[in-house]
Curated annotation (Swiss-Prot):
This is tRNA-specific 2-thiouridylase MnmA 3. NCBIfam families: PRK00143.1, PRK14664.1, trmU. It comes from Bacteroides fragilis (strain YCH46). The gene is mnmA3. It catalyses: S-sulfanyl-L-cysteinyl-[protein] + uridine(34) in tRNA + AH2 + ATP = 2-thiouridine(34) in tRNA + L-cysteinyl-[protein] + A + AMP + diphosphate + H(+). Belongs to the MnmA/TRMU family. Catalyzes the 2-thiolation of uridine at the wobble position (U34) of tRNA, leading to the formation of s(2)U34. Its main location: cytoplasm. HAMAP family: tRNA_thiouridyl_MnmA. The keyword Plastid does not apply.
Length: 362
């Protein structure tokens, strides 16, 4: 058997990025083993054919049942609780990277690699995720929940490249058709509107939730909506209500099946509470003078400060304008391009009292 330190398991989707990952690592002298996780939809024929062309071992892991029972179920449950989930953030630690580690151990691979546009950096004994060089493709936001034990076995070959450079590389290597392929920006298990997906997976949802009321911030009923799971904080389009001025979703109350509407100014926040955090070094995070947080994928980093509350939650104070704080989304903390950690945005109910209790925090 070859030296395992040069044997790497690559998560192969059959797409542009995983194909380039395999080729780049081959050029660097690694022995490549490919595994394709079938989690939804058709057989991964592209990945099989690419592996055969590259002359690498290839396996298919049929994970449709556990994927549906964990990631898809969580996605549905979050909307049923009035939250806005990001399934990639859940999938990476609970499913994708966990499965890659298990397969790597089974196949004698010390390393795992994926086509994520991110980098890794070791500093002070810790491994940090660093934003990829292509700002349009950077995926560091989705990786904050990965633990140190996983990161120490990861290789992200595409972190220093732009998407166009990767396409050019594949073209040069003779993979012209692959280099010209398009790519989907959708959630991998949803084609189209997530609301249709919820109805398809939960035929009882409409009857269970039923229509509810749009209300103003004063509690005045403004009109009926189709059910709280079909809305998200900050939403303006698709509300199907005419108020004579732009209206945005401010709050969602699952218990009362109400959706509060208001103007853009009412979406602004000075603080937020976050939970279930994963921080690389807490002392560094809390003392960081240049800390910034992203509260949505592709959103601009917002300068902030963070402190730990007595109940274990994080209190985040924004130092610049922040808007549309959506429970269920991720708050990812950066110093420059380096990820210091992240957390899930919690329910903001009762935040006024939390702010009052921490009014002396500077």
């Amino acid at each position: 058997m070859k030296e395992s330190k040069k044997r790497v398991l690559v998560g192969m989707s059959g797409g542009i990025d995983s194909t380039a990952t395999c080729l780049m690592l081959q050029e660097q002298g690694y022995e490549i083993v490919g595994v394709t996780m079938r989690v939804w939809g058709d057989e991964p024929q592209d990945a099989r054919e690419l592996a055969a062309r590259m002359g690498i071992e290839h396996y298919v892991a049929d994970e449709r049942v556990p994927f549906k029972d964990t990631i898809v179920k969580n996605f549905i449950d979050e909307y049923r609780q009035g939250r806005t989930p990001n399934p990639c953030v859940m999938c990476n630690p609970l499913f994708k990277f966990r499965m890659l580690i298990e397969w790597a151990d089974k196949l004698g691979c010390d390393w795992i690699a994926t086509g994520h546009y991110s980098r890794l950096e070791e500093r002070n004994g810790h491994i940090y995720i660093v934003a990829g060089d292509d700002d349009k493709k950077d995926q560091s936001y989705f990786l904050w929940r990965l633990g140190q034990d996983v990161l120490r076995r990861c290789i992200f070959p595409l972190g220093n490249y732009t998407k166009q450079t990767v396409r050019d590389y594949l073209h040069e290597k003779g993979y012209e058709a692959k280099s010209k392929e398009g790519e989907s920006m959708e959630v991998c298990f949803i084609k189209g509107d997530y609301r249709d997906f919820l109805r398809e997976q939960c035929p009882e949802l409409d009857a269970e939730v039923g229509p509810g009321w749009f209300v103003s911030s004063e509690g005045v009923k403004l009109g009926q909506h189709k059910g709280f799971p079909y809305y998200t904080i900050g939403q303006r389009k698709g509300l199907e209500i005419a108020l004579g001025k732009p209206a945005y979703v401010l709050k969602i109350n699952p218990q009362k099946n109400t959706v509060m509407l208001g103007d853009a100014g009412q979406l602004k926040a000075e603080y937020m509470v976050a939970e279930q955090d994963n921080i690389v070094d807490e002392d560094e995070l809390f003392a960081c003078p240049d800390l910034a947080v992203r509260i949505r994928y592709r959103s601009r980093p917002i300068p902030c400060r963070v402190k730990r509350l007595e109940d274990g939650h994080l209190l985040v104070r924004f130092l610049a304008e922040a808007s549309a704080i959506a429970p269920g989304q991720s708050a990812v903390f950066y110093e420059g391009r380096r990820v210091l950690g992240g957390a899930f945005i919690a329910s903001q109910r009762g935040i006024g009292l939390v702010i009052e209790q921490n009014k002396d925090w500077k």
